[in-house]
Amino acid sequence: MTFLNACRNGQKSIVQIFLKKGGIDVNKRDAEGNTPLYYACLKGFRDIVGLLLDSDADVSIANNCSETPLHAAARSGNKEIIGKLVQYGAELDATDKEGRTPLICLLDNKRTDAALFLIEQGADTEVADNSGHKAIDYATAHGLREVVTCLSAEGTSDTRGNTPLHQAVFNGQSETVRTLLTTSDNMLNTPNDEGETPLIIACMKGNLTVAKLLIDAGADVNKALP
């Protein structure tokens, strides 16, 4: 049994034995570049995370995919572990090989509370991943209304010119559409790169509920595709 495997398997008592014995490299990486801390964060083993951090585990070491322990914690969604990593100086806006920050990972996993916590801690909401998507785009796509409300969607669009409103309409997120409409009306008649307005997309999708919301908000019913 290696120290790294004990951390990965959640064997707290064995981890304690290794640490008490001493001479352990708490930051030793495996072939994938993952550290004991990375695995403990990924699996949600908060007690082991605490032991490792108290033993000077490095919160900034990234694996071969440029994922840090905070990325791993974002995948497991454990808010307590995320808070602990932040307390020990984890980089909030580190990006993995896909350009995703821990915040984006949290939103993609629909972890609203933990995402709001990272935003409160100062996570950059304007970082775009390699696909051009920002935090607001993920929050919109997954219907995370609390996050949508706290983020500014002004002037935000993806690589195809789709605004958060386009995305909410495309995904049939009627409550998110309602939230975005109360936040700003600047996106209401904005076309994407294909010339499609949110209303056109709603009609193409046959979503009468969303179409009515847009029309009631003042969407231009005469705007046509170019």
Summary of predicted features, one role per range:
Residues 17-24, 50-58, 83-90, 116-124, ...:
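Ankyrin repeat domain, specifically the short helix-to-loop turn at the C-terminus of the second helix
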Residues 2, 121, 130-133, 137-171, ...:
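Ankyrin-repeat-protein effector appendages
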Residues 57-83, 87-91, 96-100, 104-108:
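A generic tandem-repeat structural signature
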Residues 93-127, 204:
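Ankyrin-repeat and related helical/solenoid repeat scaffolds used for protein-protein interactions
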Residues 1-35, 160-190:
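N-terminal segments that cap or nucleate solenoid repeat domains
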Residues 5-10, 39-45, 72-78, 105-111, ...:
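Ankyrin repeat A-helix N-terminal signature
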